[in-house]
């Protein structure tokens, strides 16, 4: 199956956000490291950069936005889950051009590929609750 440029952008953004969360390195350093160590030709670079930079610059706001829908303390989140939720929350709040169903599906696929065994179920549940508020108009 051919992977879309946006999916590749999300996968690399996830790697970048995870790296940034763990290392606390400057986001430009993380971005440069990813760009030099990956084939970026089939990646939607603008989308990758928007996700990576958007999460890095708005992490606290994104965390506060998704927190009511988690059903557990944010400190209990696995680092991959946190990164996926931050990316998806950014997309839900800032990328109105992307349908919420696409955002949730992509987050689930990231969780299946990179998360713990049941992460995708948790991600799905949290985001499904979040869209009831964050994308209320789209759901009606």
From Swiss-Prot:
Protein name: Transcription antitermination protein NusB
Family per similarity comment: Belongs to the NusB family.
Entry keyword annotation includes Transcription: yes
GO MF, one example: RNA binding
Top-level taxon of the source organism: Bacteria
Lineage of origin: Bacteria, Pseudomonadati, Pseudomonadota, Gammaproteobacteria, Alteromonadales
Entries under InterPro entries matching the protein: NusB-like_sf (IPR035926), NusB_fam (IPR011605), NusB_RsmB_TIM44 (IPR006027)
Role played: Involved in transcription antitermination. Required for transcription of ribosomal RNA (rRNA) genes. Binds specifically to the boxA antiterminator sequence of the ribosomal RNA (rrn) operons.
GO biological processes: DNA-templated transcription termination; transcription antitermination
Keywords: RNA-binding, Transcription, Transcription antitermination, Transcription regulation
Organism, scientific name: Alteromonas mediterranea (strain DSM 17117 / CIP 110805 / LMG 28347 / Deep ecotype)
SUPFAM superfamilies registered for this protein in UniProt: NusB-like
Pfam annotation, one family: NusB
GO CC annotation terms, alphabetical: cytosol
């Amino acid at each position: 199956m051919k992977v879309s440029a946006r999916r590749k952008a999300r996968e690399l953004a996830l790697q970048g956000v995870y790296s940034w969360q763990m290392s606390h390195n400057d986001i430009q350093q993380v971005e440069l490291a990813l760009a030099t160590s990956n084939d970026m030709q089939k990646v939607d670079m603008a989308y990758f950069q928007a996700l990576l930079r958007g999460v890095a610059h708005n992490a606290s706001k994104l965390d506060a936005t998704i927190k009511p829908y988690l059903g557990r303390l944010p400190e209990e989140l696995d680092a991959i889950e946190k990164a996926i939720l931050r990316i998806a929350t950014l997309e839900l709040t800032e990328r109105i051009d992307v349908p919420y169903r696409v955002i949730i599906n992509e987050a689930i696929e990231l969780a299946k590929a990179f998360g713990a065994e049941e992460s995708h179920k948790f991600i799905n549940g949290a985001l499904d609750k979040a869209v009831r508020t964050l994308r209320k108009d789209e759901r009606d």
